[in-house]
A protein has these predicted regions:
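Key DNA-contacting residues within the recognition helix of helix-turn-helix
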Residues: 2-5, 183
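Short, solvent-exposed alpha-helical "recognition" segments
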Residues: 5-19, 189-193
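Dynamic "connector" segments at or just before major functional cores
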Residues: 21-243, 248-268, 276-280, 284-285, ...
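An anionic, glycine-rich sequence signature occurring as long contiguous blocks
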Residues: 80-86, 306, 310-401, 406, ...
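Acidic, metal-coordinating catalytic cores used for nucleic-acid/nucleotide bond scission
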Residues: 293-303, 321-324
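C-terminal, active-site-flanking charged/polar segments
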Residues: 314, 332, 384, 392-428, ...
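Extended alpha-helical coiled-coil "stalk/arm" regions
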Residues: 450-497, 501-504
């Protein structure tokens, strides 16, 4: 109680004020907050001595400001706000900044304008509401996770390597949340089960801002290998040429490689099964607009092509399987210019029919210098052949996206060990059928070899010695009997295989519970990394006119700026961020131009009225 009294005296509270019935029992923004009947909220309230309403944080019931206010005045001591959170009177600690020099990693604040335009904070507020009374509320937790991704702190455990006080100064807090706190916040969000809704809301925001760049959408699966002890469905990993326990995610990216949304496949379903639900979500995002979807050979299915066309989409994909090679004389040089770069291809353009002639498509085949032919199928008749080839080969940007997120953002990291029940009636390949089928294939191969040997003996038979077939059979009687035995074994194995179902419910194959990895927390962290990557991409686009090597070094430049130290200067209405110069003068000049563009956005720090003003010190 003595500590409480000291805190109250420091805040300037009086016994009269403490006796008022208007003491807030719930935050005004809480969805179920109500005033007692017959009582109107008072407009009077106490503000900490010297506290600036534009800086931060706590709002009483009668507060009229658009941002809550804090009872703390010292940015390094937020004990009053922590006390209010403990008493259940605070949903989220508002940012409170102090002037500081060379704050480590404060350059990450450059990302706030583009994070703000992504709508991530508004979407989170709409979908999740709040996390209840807390010092680290929804906004603070979400901002921490986003900045961690941009700092390349790939897991909550990585926070152990950084000073909470230093990270807190960037967040406008006395301390950043630590590992257990952040895990608990993620668990709270995952318990809501709304990651899919959150992802849809973010995708709607992205479409609203960049709809013109979404005429071509690239769909591809990404396999996350599982190394734990749970028995999970297997997926084929192309790099390993093996089927291993894993989880498959299907990402949809735009033509620049930036992600739009992600879906997790049930039991590692293939592209043919996953494309219909993916296109259903694309239709919900894009409306009736006709979109071209681009995917690899995993989605090759003429019947699926019909479904895609009936759903009002166009498509591009590689042709799978055998096809008639095209003679050299049918190939011609085609050129196209995209984003200022000229692309040249040797192409043959022709019409093909699938499904016994019912499906007519266009095939554009590329010929490489080594003679390899790559056929591309599409229904688009309006595009030049070179454009079709370029759009198809542009898939490499999505592959680079997977590689970049895996290395820089730990896309494949296991977020939690928890498992949830899976469908026990889900059908899987029957291992008994597979074992018999393997024996049958071996037996059939053995029979084929014996028959080939018998045929060779017949072909080389000397007629002078054995002029009749009867004589040949007698001479080859031992080989003939071996062939009959092998034939009978093949027939027996075929009967055994036909008596066994090819697929069975998964529950019949194991006595252990049928489970899968808990998807919610992983989906949520994927969305956070997706938004961080989008913000990084937006910054690269903004700096592109001012940096010649943006294609090769754009992301490296932005990453260096986000990781740099900065001076913080606070006024009544502004937070000035002055970055330290970068490694060279031309890189510093590029970031200076970026700062000028960001200043035009008039962005406010999330949760406060402070407008952000950026600058960078010139190289000495």
């Amino acid at each position: 109680m003595r500590a409480v009294r000291k805190t109250l005296r420091r805040l300037g509270w009086t016994p009269v004020l403490l006796a008022q019935t208007e003491l807030p029992l719930a935050l005004p923004s809480a969805p179920h907050s109500k005033h007692p009947q017959g009582q109107a909220p008072s407009s009077s309230g106490s503000t900490a001595s010297g506290g600036d309403p534009n800086l931060s944080a706590f709002s009483t019931l009668g507060a009229q400001n658009s941002f809550p206010r804090s009872h703390d005045t010292d940015p390094t001591d937020r004990s009053a706000d922590r006390l209010l959170a403990r008493l259940g009177l605070l949903e989220d600690a508002a940012p409170l900044f102090g002037c500081a020099v060379a704050v480590p990693r404060a350059g990450v604040l450059l990302a706030l304008p583009v994070l703000g335009t992504s709508g991530v904070f508004e979407c989170a507020q709409k979908i999740y509401g709040n996390l209840g009374p807390a010092f680290y509320g929804l906004r603070t937790s979400l901002l921490t996770l986003l900045l961690m991704a941009l700092w390349r702190i790939k897991r909550p455990e990585g926070l152990k390597e950084y000073s909470p006080q230093e990270l807190g100064r960037v967040l406008g807090l006395d301390r950043a949340p630590e590992v257990k706190t952040l895990r608990r916040k993620l668990a709270q969000l995952a318990a809501c089960g709304r990651a899919a809704q959150f992802g849809q809301a973010l995708a709607h925001q992205r479409v609203a801002r960049r709809g013109k760049d979404l005429g071509f959408l690239y769909v591809d699966g990404h396999v996350r290998i599982y190394h734990g002890k749970l028995r999970l469905p297997k997926a084929h990993v192309a790099q390993m040429r093996l089927s291993v326990p894993a989880t498959s995610d299907y990402w949809v990216n735009d033509k620049t490689g930036d992600p739009l949304f992600v879906l997790t496949a049930e039991a590692n379903a293939g592209m043919v099964k996953m494309l219909p639900p993916v296109l259903k979500q694309v239709r919900a995002l894009m409306g009736e607009r006709r979109v071209t979807v681009v995917f690899d050979r995993g989605g090759y299915s003429p019947k699926l092509f019909e479904q895609i066309l009936e759903a009002g989409f166009d498509f591009l994909t590689y042709r799978k399987g055998r096809f008639a090679r095209i003679t050299r004389k049918h190939f011609q040089v085609h050129r196209t210019r995209v984003e200022g770069q000229c692309h040249t291809y040797l192409l043959a353009d022709q019409k093909v029919r699938l499904l016994k002639g019912k499906l007519r498509l266009r095939q554009v085949t590329r010929l490489k210098e080594n003679g390899h032919q790559t056929p591309i199928l599409t229904n688009r008749e309006d595009l030049p052949a070179a454009q079709i080839a370029h759009r198809m080969f542009n898939r490499w940007k999505q592959e680079i996206f997977f590689k970049y997120l895996g290395e820089e953002y730990a896309l494949d990291a296991l977020v939690e060990y928890a498992a949830v029940p899976d469908d026990p009636l889900r059908e899987v390949p029957n291992p008994t059928w597979a074992a018999i089928d393997a024996k049958l294939r071996q037996a059939q191969a053995h029979l084929d070899r014996l028959q080939a040997e018998y045929g060779l003996e017949a072909l080389t038979n000397a007629e002078k010695q054995r002029s009749t077939m009867r004589g040949f059979k007698i001479a080859q009687g031992k080989l003939g009997q071996t062939i009959w035995n092998a034939f009978e074994r093949v027939q027996q194995l075929e009967k055994r295989r036909n008596a066994v179902p090819r697929r069975v419910p998964v529950q019949t194959l194991t006595e252990e519970p049928v489970v899968k990895l808990a998807p919610e927390r992983k989906h949520l962290t994927n969305l956070i990394k997706m938004v961080a990557y989008q913000a990084e991409s937006d910054l690269v686009r903004l700096v592109a006119p001012h940096y010649k090597r943006v294609g090769d070094e754009g992301r490296t430049l932005i990453q260096s700026a986000l990781a740099s130290a900065a001076n913080l200067e606070v006024t009544d209405t502004k937070l000035r961020i002055t970055l330290a110069p970068l490694s060279s003068a031309h890189r510093t000049r590029a970031i200076a131009r970026l700062c000028e563009e960001l200043n035009q956005t008039q962005t406010q720090f999330p949760g406060s009225g402070l407008r952000l003003r950026y600058a960078i010190r010139e190289s000495s």
